[in-house]
Amino acid sequence: MSKSTTVLITGANKGIGLGMAKAYLSRPNHIVICSVRSAKTDVTDLEAASKASGSKLLLVYIESTSKTDPAKAVEDVQAAGVDHLDVLIANAGGMPEGNKPLLELGPDELCWSVQVNAAAPLLVLQAFKPLLQKADAPRFAVISSTSGSIEHMKNIHSFIFPGYGAAKATLNWLTMGVHLSQEWLTTLVIHPGLVQSEPGNWVAKQIGMAEAPTTIEQAAEGVIKALTNATRESVGGKFLSTSDGTVLPW
């Protein structure tokens, strides 16, 4: 009997998170753990996803501003029989409401964005570390954005999304720190492209596009392809654009 590959995806009820969940569930022998905000979150599409032989879906609840949800999620998956975690994809995130200009951005909006986009992924990693350490080749990826690239700011004018961009830059810093300090773990930062999700299409319109160029299915497959055989030597510590395979500047 084949050993199951266990994957955790945060923010998996919509957008690229849902796309990745569906793609993993369509592969045989995958336990796909999907985190959503709460029991009130609509998970109809997740539960309806086709499942290959030996694959199954587990739901856990992680609200990105909660300090205790990640630890409770670990307890829940262990109670369901999960004894290791092969892949952790920190996908959940968000943009501050209103997207205020840089010189109008208040501390509350900035702190909220850093909590949701940077601190929350770190808390999830901290909680699931023991299960990752039981995997043969554990991998940790964060879904970031070119908005978090300081070098790219002058080219793409990402300062028009100050709360989001600053938080993603913080996420990038933390993830590089994980790569350098945790030599047992393959860690990378992923930019999946400008994706046809609700926030992706909103961003596209802000820069004069009718819609984002990358479909959810393309983005999901790009991330999964990058992670399937990822090693520290091949992608560890890199800021990888999975839509075209390029390595992005920090």
UniProtKB/Swiss-Prot annotation:
GO terms for cellular component: cytoplasm. InterPro entries: Fungal_SecMetab_SDRs, NAD(P)-bd_dom_sf, SDR_fam. Pathway: Polyketide biosynthesis. NADP(+) binds at residues 16, 35, 63, 91, 164, 168, 195, 197. Keywords: NADP, Oxidoreductase. The active site is at 145 (proton donor), 164 (proton donor), 168 (lowers pka of active site tyr). The keyword NADP applies. It holds the Pfam family adh_short. It is an enzyme of class 1 (oxidoreductase). Its EC number is 1.1.1.-. GO terms for molecular function: oxidoreductase activity. Induction: Expression is increased in rice-extract medium (REM) and is correlated with the production of pyriculol. The keyword Acyltransferase does not apply. Short-chain dehydrogenase; part of the gene cluster that mediates the biosynthesis of pyriculol and pyriculariol, two heptaketides that induce lesion formation upon application on rice leaves but are dispensable for pathogenicity. The highly reducing polyketide synthase synthesizes the heptaketide backbone of pyriculol and pyriculariol. Pyriculol and pyriculariol contain several hydroxyl moieties and double bonds, so it can be assumed that several reduction steps occur during biosynthesis. Belongs to the short-chain dehydrogenases/reductases (SDR) family. This is Short-chain dehydrogenase RED3. It comes from Pyricularia oryzae (strain 70-15 / ATCC MYA-4617 / FGSC 8958) (Rice blast fungus).
